[in-house]
């Protein structure tokens, strides 16, 4: 199991709601992202508190770039959702490079997993299957299962087989994926302090 630290992922949705007042609830983001112009190239780099892995730049600052005359609320919301997936993609690629191993699947939990647009984009931009268990927050469940397995109360194979899941498969063309990711990397380069 590998883990990486990101400073600002799901909290970007809170920023849209509480600070910018663009939405009244996180649920609105999926519909707005789907309404956005698919050709829009707006990127949000949420370096409000610097950037964590793999950049480790505490002096990086947030930015919204690529705005055009046709960029509106829906496009900014989409850029906010996309930045979550881009940051995770940065981590996945860094982990693959550091370990020399290919990650086949992402297993994710938490509130943002309820957003179908975000989960499909995550699958598309990482080019990985995204597996989401029906249980929203797995940390507590996982700790209980680990204790139960250690005590001989639970069987790992049986538990794994009983979990219901939603699965997203990548659908994005490789050329489009790399073009979008290159745009993200350019946006990130623009905020780095080094």
What positions do the PLM features span?
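Glycine/Thr-rich phosphate-binding loops that ligate phosphate moieties of nucleotide
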Residues: 1-194
């Amino acid at each position: 199991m590998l883990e990486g630290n990101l400073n600002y992922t799901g909290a970007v949705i809170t920023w849209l709601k509480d600070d910018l007042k663009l939405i009244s609830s996180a649920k609105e983001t999926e519909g707005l992202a789907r309404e956005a112009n698919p050709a829009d190239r707006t990127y949000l780099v949420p370096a409000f508190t610097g950037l964590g892995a793999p950049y480790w730049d505490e002096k990086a600052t947030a930015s919204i770039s690529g705005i055009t005359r046709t960029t509106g609320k829906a496009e900014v919301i989409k850029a906010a959702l996309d930045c979550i997936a881009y940051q995770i993609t940065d981590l996945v690629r860094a982990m693959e490079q550091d370990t020399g191993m290919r990650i086949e699947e992402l297993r994710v939990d938490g509130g943002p997993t309820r957003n179908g647009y975000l989960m499909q984009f995550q699958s598309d931009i990482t080019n990985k299957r995204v597996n989401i268990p029906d249980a929203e927050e797995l940390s507590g469940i996982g700790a209980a299962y680990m204790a139960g397995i250690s005590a001989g109360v639970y069987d790992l194979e049986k538990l794994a087989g009983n979990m219901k899941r939603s699965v997203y498969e990548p659908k994005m063309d490789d050329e489009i994926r790399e073009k979008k990711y290159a745009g993200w990397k350019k946006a990130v380069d623009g905020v780095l302090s080094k």
